């Protein structure tokens, strides 16, 4: 799950503070030529004696610099939402000022200019504030239309919706609210509880303060939220087919075949590696042809190998089972053209 990156407000201070007074923006005003922002009172007082931007020295206007500045309502709303208690303190200072100087009039002033706008009307929230919300089951668009028709006909009073009211801190997330509903209603783990604002599902990491800022709720009533219960999505796991890797034996038969492929058959062995020498005719190229003949014990039944099996050569061993020698007793074998004794 992807979450939003949380950063400290001190990292945003260079973008929220006025370079002239060193405080947060109050009535933020932006210069059109260079888009640098300042407090309205600060920049108006500065341009009375200067015609250049205090940050980049761009000429604002040759004769009337006040024509090149604009009120930045969006930036001011961002500052009020990011800095806790700033809007409330500013409105209090304005009310105190006009209370101390009752004869002072505000030309074309609004309620906000006079400090008569409450924090609830502005929609600003703090982390420690308590938010009143209503939660009810989401019935869908079709059920809501049917319910509306019943209400218009006068039959809707018989059905009462299960609306519940809660008081929660503004910093509480949607995930915590969903867990609360799951525990309250004993929802099994195979189902998920989803929170909605009207018909739009909410992200789990949204706080109640985020919902108040994103959606058109002006604190003139409880925050209207809805919930629905849906089956949890299960991830499909595809079965993995094991693929035999090269050089690995999967059975005893394959191991036997690999050994038999490496060891040659007795019929194609050279004379030096023959395991059936003849005492009458020494093998050509063998060490016994240049020296005294070696004596070999004779056995009534010479060793033989069954078809499909291999004999140990050069000190090698075989892990295959050998058949009894009686199966190959009638087979004739020759070594270098000389018949072997039976």
Curated annotation (Swiss-Prot):
Q: Does the keyword S-adenosyl-L-methionine apply?
A: no
**What GO terms in the biological process aspect are recorded for it?**
anterior/posterior pattern specification; apoptotic signaling pathway; cellular response to hydrogen peroxide; chromatin organization; chromatin remodeling; embryonic skeletal system development; embryonic skeletal system morphogenesis; in utero embryonic development
Query: Mind telling me which Gene3D superfamilies this protein's record contains?
Result: Phosphatidylinositol 3-kinase Catalytic Subunit, Chain A, domain 1 (3.10.20.90), Zinc/RING finger domain, C3HC4 (zinc finger) (3.30.40.10)
Compositionally biased spans, kind Polar residues: 243-253, 319-328
Q: Which GO terms describe its molecular function?
A: chromatin binding; DNA binding; zinc ion binding
Query: What the entry says about post-translational processing?
Result: Phosphorylated. Homodimer formation is regulated by phosphorylation with only unphosphorylated proteins forming homodimers.
Q: Where is this motif: Nuclear localization signal?
A: 81-95
Q: What is the associated disease?
A: Probably related to tumorigenesis since it is expressed strongly in most tumor cell lines.
Q: How does it assemble?
A: Exists as both a monomer and homodimer. Component of a PRC1-like complex. Interacts with CBX8, RING1 and RNF2. Interacts with CBX7. Interacts with PHC2.
Name assigned to this protein: Polycomb group RING finger protein 2
To which species is this protein native? Mus musculus (Mouse)
């Amino acid at each position: 799950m992807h979450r939003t990156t949380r950063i400290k407000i001190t990292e945003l201070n260079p973008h929220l503070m006025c370079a002239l007074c060193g405080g947060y923006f109050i009535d933020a005003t932006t210069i059109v030529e260079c888009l640098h922002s300042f407090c309205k009172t600060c920049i108006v007082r500065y341009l009375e004696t200067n015609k250049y931007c205090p940050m980049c020295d761009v000429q604002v206007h040759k004769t009337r610099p006040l024509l090149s500045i604009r009120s930045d309502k969006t930036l001011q709303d961002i500052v009020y939402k990011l800095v806790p208690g700033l809007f409330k303190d500013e409105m209090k200072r304005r009310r105190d000022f006009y209370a101390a100087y009752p004869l002072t009039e505000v030309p074309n002033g609004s309620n906000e200019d006079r400090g008569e706008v409450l924090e609830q009307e502005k929609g600003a929230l703090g982390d420690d504030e308590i938010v009143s919300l209503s939660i009810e089951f989401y019935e869908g668009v079709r059920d809501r239309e049917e319910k509306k028709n019943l209400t218009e006909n006068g039959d809707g009073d018989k059905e009462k919706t299960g609306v519940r009211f809660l008081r929660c801190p503004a910093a509480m997330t949607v995930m915590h609210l969903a867990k609360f509903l799951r525990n309250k209603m004993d929802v099994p783990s195979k189902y998920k509880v989803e929170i909605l604002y009207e018909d739009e599902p909410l992200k789990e990491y949204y706080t109640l303060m985020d919902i108040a800022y994103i959606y058109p709720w002006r604190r003139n009533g409880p925050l209207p939220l809805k919930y629905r219960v849906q089956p949890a999505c299960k991830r499909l796991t595809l079965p993995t087919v094991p693929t035999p890797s090269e050089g690995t034996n999967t059975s005893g038969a394959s191991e036997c075949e690999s050994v038999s492929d490496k060891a040659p058959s007795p019929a194609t062995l050279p004379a030096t590696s023959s395991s059936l020498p003849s005492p009458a005719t020494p093998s050509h190229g063998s060490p016994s042809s240049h020296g005294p003949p070696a004596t070999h014990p004779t056995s009534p039944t010479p060793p033989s190998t069954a078809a499909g099996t291999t004999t140990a050569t050069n000190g090698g061993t075989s892990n295959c089972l050998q058949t009894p020698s009686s199966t190959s007793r009638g087979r004739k074998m020759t070594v270098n053209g000389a018949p072997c004794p039976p």
